[in-house]
């Protein structure tokens, strides 16, 4: 299923109860202890853990790339700590964010500055060192998902 979390939340359990095996790409089931989080190149042996709910989840895109690259190194050398920088596309924040990027970019050429609404700062021609919401421990949700 490639839907927003609310769609997966509603329909994946229905399909699972009807004995369909659901492979969900949304974020909804990623932290569910009864749903295996699978990266086939890293932990294919956990695929059979889907049987409680008939749902398999996958991590977010940054995590998949990171664990795929680090898995063979970890097996050989036992990695203890990793420092990661990710750069996320504006498109991941949705249509309103894309519209804001377009309008800000256009505004640079016609001397029309707009006030950011989707981001904390102007996004056109910029890199913002922040993604998602802040958690109680001061990290962002994106950092939490990768830890």
What spans do the regions from the language model cover?
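N-terminal Rossmann-like NAD(P) cofactor-binding subdomain of oxidoreductases
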Residues: 1-123
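Oxyanion-binding "anion nests"
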Residues: 118-147
């Amino acid at each position: 299923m490639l839907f927003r979390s609310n769609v997966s939340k509603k329909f994946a359990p229905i399909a699972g109860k009807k004995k369909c095996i659901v492979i969900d790409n949304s974020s909804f089931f990623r932290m569910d202890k009864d749903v295996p989080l699978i990266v086939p190149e890293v932990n294919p042996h956990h695929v059979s853990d889907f049987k409680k709910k008939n749902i398999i989840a996958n991590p977010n895109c940054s995590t998949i790339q990171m664990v795929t690259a680090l898995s063979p190194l970890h097996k050989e050398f036992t990695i203890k700590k990793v420092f990661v920088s990710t750069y996320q596309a504006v498109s991941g924040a949705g249509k309103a964010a894309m519209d804001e990027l377009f309008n800000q970019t256009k505004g640079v050429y016609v001397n029309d500055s707009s006030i950011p609404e989707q981001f904390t700062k102007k996004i056109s021609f910029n890199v913002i060192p922040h993604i998602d919401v802040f958690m109680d421990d001061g990290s962002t949700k994106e950092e939490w998902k990768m830890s």
